[in-house]
């Protein structure tokens, strides 16, 4: 009888623990990535068939919220070779670390990514930004160039592989 009683208590307790673990895992989603996820409306604006690049001069870092309800993001303003100011959207503030590129106003940059229209405004969603003014190239990578997968959605192992330096192009 005692053995049956222990099983009777253990099984419900185990179920409660499993439910609690699932709730904890679900709540561990980073709120700093809201709206920036792989299948999000924002990410659907990145059409790899429109892949392009341009050169210009870095002007400033800006805070962005591309679509209502998204977590805050980071962008930069680049003056292109025609003198036009381009908003380059990099990614969520919780992921993008601008200090890795060491950009200063006037630095020459090469930006790779896609042109798109968001809320009636033409913007450039970046996959890479290279600082061409610091001697050897320093770059900030935020998406896979092959398919536009955001780096903030990669596993730690995938991210480590992608962060390896590439030969200059």
Please give the residue ranges for each predicted region.
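Bacterial N-terminal signal peptides
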Residues: 11-21
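OB-fold (S1/OB) nucleic-acid-binding surfaces
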Residues: 67-90
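Extended, charge-rich, solvent-exposed interface segments
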Residues: 135-169
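Short nucleic-acid-contacting surface segments enriched for D/E, G, S/T with interspersed K/R
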Residues: 94-111
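OB-fold/S1-family single-stranded nucleic acid-binding modules
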Residues: 116-148
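Bacterial N-terminal signal peptides that target proteins for export
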Residues: 2-13
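Structural detector for short beta-strands of small beta-barrel domains
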Residues: 50-70
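Short boundary/loop segments of OB/S1/cold-shock single-stranded nucleic-acid-binding domains
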Residues: 30-53
